[in-house]
Amino acid sequence: MSKNPPDLSGGEVKAKQIRFDSDARSALQEGVDQMAEAVKVTLGPKGRNVVLEKSFGAPTITKDGVTVAKEIELEERLPNIGAQVLKEAASKTNDDAGDGTTTATVLAQSVINAGMKSVTSGANPMDVKRGITAAAEEVVTHLRNQSDPVEGKDRISQVATISANNDDAIGDLIADAFERVGQDGVITVEEARGIETYLDVVEGMQFDRGYLSPYFVTDSEEMEAVLEDAYILIYDDEVGNMQDLLPILEKVSQTSNPLLIIAEDVEGEALATLVVNKMRGTLKVSAVKAPGFGDRRQSMLEDIAVLTGGTVISEEKGYRLENATLDYLGQADRVTIDQDNTTIVGGEGSEEEIEARVNQIRQQIANSTSDYDQEKLQERLAKLAGGVAVLNVGAATEPEMKAQKALVEDALSATRAAVDEGVLPGGGVAYLRALESIEEVEVENEDQEIGVSIVREALEAPLRQIAENTGHEGSIVVQKVKDGEGDFGFNARTEEYGDLLDQGVLDPTKVTRSALENAASVGGMLLTTEAVIADLEDEDDDDGGGGGGGGMPAGGAGGMGGMGGMGGMM
């Protein structure tokens, strides 16, 4: 017989286990500790490696905290809930700031463990949480006030180097990328085909549409069509009838300038005539399809028009192709078209109009709630205001490639965060210097004061862990740094004390702030948890193990129920 109770429809309801009060919190704490112990060994420049088994392919060796956290799923259901909640704090920090997952994990573990002790001793969980929240808010305000703006290539390189586990080469490459494409540019990370790590920069506007016919090629070795001082015709419909295109072609041919046609499509008679004119040398011309789809296509055509000083010829707006004049056309110093991409360099659009368009897109990014829309808008912004840089990461082996790529992505995200909100002295020093700000927190009772003390203790945890990963006694290092002032701290890379800002040991303010905010949030949430409900643990019983058909349904149903429960957890 099944152990699960029947529901009214004749099926089975999966039985649940329920834990209350201290039993619930201790089960969650067990999972938090297992997660934190695996992640926090990666903290700092001398953090240790973690090896991750993969179901296929080679194992991954990494020092990236979020990569370790994402791999963790515990066997026991209740502790696993605690681990997943802590994972959420780490992931949220990574989403917000692009780095700081390990710091958030260390802070959260300290808050949770100290909080659990106080609640078990009889403190009011809600008041403890209020104290934690008040103290964290005060520290965040202090961090923002102490933040130092990041300006100049050298400072950007320092931040990127720290985030890349002190790899100077990666730090310099990221700084070069920011210098080349600017803050609004798009910087992506790709796997290189060889062992070298290098930077590719596409200046100007590039979109993923190639020539419509190979007969448009002007450089047969590179298989590219290169148009110098080109006119650009931007049309939001298909071109099939050559008669519509003929008037503007005649006007362009009189100038001897080449022409790029960007349209929804160019086909049939129109395409054939363009190819013939190109082959005869009558007109230097090339044609490509418009980038994007739907409303996004229209927006991208408008971007091209603003960049080149042209007009989108659209019958919806009263413009007809057969009536087009040279004033409708955009212009650019150089257009390069290959089989897959078109690049426009030196568009002759008005700087004022380009700036207005850039500000409009920035506003759309700020108002958008969709990550996908924000990403696409950021790409458009980069093509107008900056450019696109690609960091190609090379390595000798696949595991090294994966680890190196994750490292570069982390460093890039942290550098963006630093450019956004500035930097603070690294190595956990910023948290220690913020201890004085907690003294100003006003509390209403003793339990809230306990919450403030919990944050006070947690602020020491990152430096303590960095020191221990380096092989030093954490308490001694923390006390020596507390005895110092300002940017004085412990440089874990050199294992010496000194002015960390002067030594280039920096942390982005956004990372430092987000790590504390998310740690305080998840800590307060777990402290105020009074019940946990989860599926029962899977049991190895003999109900489904007997021979014959009778055992099969019972065993199958039990197995499926267990899988369903795990699905709900993930």
Swiss-Prot record:
| Catalytic reaction equation(s) | ATP + H2O + a folded polypeptide = ADP + phosphate + an unfolded polypeptide
Any GO BP: protein refolding
Q: Which UniProt keywords apply?
A: ATP-binding, Chaperone, Cytoplasm, Isomerase, Nucleotide-binding
Q: Where does ATP bind?
A: T42, L43, G44, P45, K63, D99, G100, T101, T102, T103, G427, D507
Q: Which GO terms describe its molecular function?
A: ATP binding; ATP-dependent protein folding chaperone; isomerase activity; unfolded protein binding
Please, which domain of life does this record's source organism belong to? Bacteria
Tell me one Pfam family matched here: Cpn60_TCP1
Provide the family line.
Answer: Belongs to the chaperonin (HSP60) family.
Task of the protein:
Together with its co-chaperonin GroES, plays an essential role in assisting protein folding. The GroEL-GroES system forms a nano-cage that allows encapsulation of the non-native substrate proteins and provides a physical environment optimized to promote and accelerate protein folding.
Q: What's the protein name?
A: Chaperonin GroEL 1
According to its UniProt entry, this protein's organism is Salinibacter ruber (strain DSM 13855 / M31)
Q: What is the lineage of its organism?
A: Bacteria, Pseudomonadati, Rhodothermota, Rhodothermia, Rhodothermales
Give the gene that encodes this protein.
groEL1
